[in-house]
Amino acid sequence: MLTDPIADMLTRIRNAHLALHKEVNVPRSRMKESLAAILKQEGYVEDVAVADSNITITLKYLKGKPVISGLKRISTPGRRVYVGAHKIPRVQNGLGICILSTSSGVLDGMTAHEKKVGGELLCEIW
């Protein structure tokens, strides 16, 4: 049993990118579906396909190099990190995104700031 499924998902994406794989499969959960949807919406992955028990994420490359250059898990099961709406960090001076779990669902940092909601800072992607 995994203690941190979100970190496992990010690690699978990172490892698949380093191995230049076309797609990666991760076990399905609603939180991971929301994370994958945000990655697709922000242009970090090509496509997201949800099946009964897993999520297939088609990775995106630009001239043979991965679009995602870094992934970082912020809030962990042992150390939760919460931020208010006005304390949402800018990632890589605006070149990346942060993903939060809020009362309005899982949102990227810009959307959470526009809606003026804070929450648990899940990860940063650049």
Swiss-Prot record:
One of its GO terms (biological process) is translation. GO terms for cellular component: ribonucleoprotein complex; ribosome. InterPro entries: Ribosomal_uS8, Ribosomal_uS8_CS, Ribosomal_uS8_sf. GO terms for molecular function: rRNA binding; structural constituent of ribosome. Keywords: Ribonucleoprotein, Ribosomal protein, RNA-binding, rRNA-binding. Pfam families: Ribosomal_S8. Belongs to the universal ribosomal protein uS8 family. NCBIfam families: PRK00136.1. Part of the 30S ribosomal subunit. Contacts proteins S5 and S12. One of the primary rRNA binding proteins, it binds directly to 16S rRNA central domain where it helps coordinate assembly of the platform of the 30S subunit. This is Small ribosomal subunit protein uS8.
